[in-house]
Amino acid sequence: MVETGDSILDLQAIFGNANPVYIEIGSGKGEFISTYPRFHPEWNFLGFEVRGKRIRNCLKKLSPAVNSNVRLVERAVNASISQYIAPESIAGAFIQHPDPWPKKKHHRRRLIQQDLLNSLAGILVPDATIQVSTDHQEYANWIVEEFLTSPHFISIYEEVMQEEPNLDNHVVTWFEREQARMGYPPNYMLFRKI
């Protein structure tokens, strides 16, 4: 576990090396953060999750011998991320099935908002990518609009929403599996910092 405060995290000290650092925002039940980094031992991964129970589930799935390039942070990600992550220090980000907050009165709680995108643009290296997936069609439309109206990002794909994952070694998360089982196929999006 990585403790965050008001000071900038020393990522090299946290991981013990200077390898590129990727973040997962909302590690959920831990499928992605415990599996995908195994395919990329040359990268470091910092998983953020706000719920203590989910952090404990993630920790159960992580093995120090296998997941030596993974660290977890129990903290909500919002625009304040730029207060504890150094500018242009993150190689990329993964956001898997964030809470869609479907009721209109709750839309202000949605993760993907301009203030977060502005902060992410500040901490990402040039040309870094953000991979996003959601099974909620209206939220997918919202995400696309937020990214495409941001001055910091463009879609990698001409057709912004894809039906197939845009990652080698795609990890199917519990949320993706459950929603697909109920007839809600995921949309995959990939954006690049400009």
Description of each model-found segment:
Residues I112-P126:
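A short glycine-rich, Lys/Arg-flanked "PGG" loop and its adjoining helix->strand segment in the class I
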Residues P126-T134:
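Conserved beta-strand signature within the Rossmann-like core of class I S-adenosyl-L-methionine
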Residues E145, S150-I194:
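Class I S-adenosyl-L-methionine
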Residues G26-G28:
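Class I SAM-dependent methyltransferase "Motif I" SAM/SAH-binding loop
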Residues M1-V21, E31-R38, L59-P87:
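S-adenosyl-L-methionine
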Residues R51:
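Conserved SAM/SAH-binding beta-strand->alpha-helix loop
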Residues R56-K61, W142:
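Short alpha-helix adjacent to the SAM-binding motif of class I
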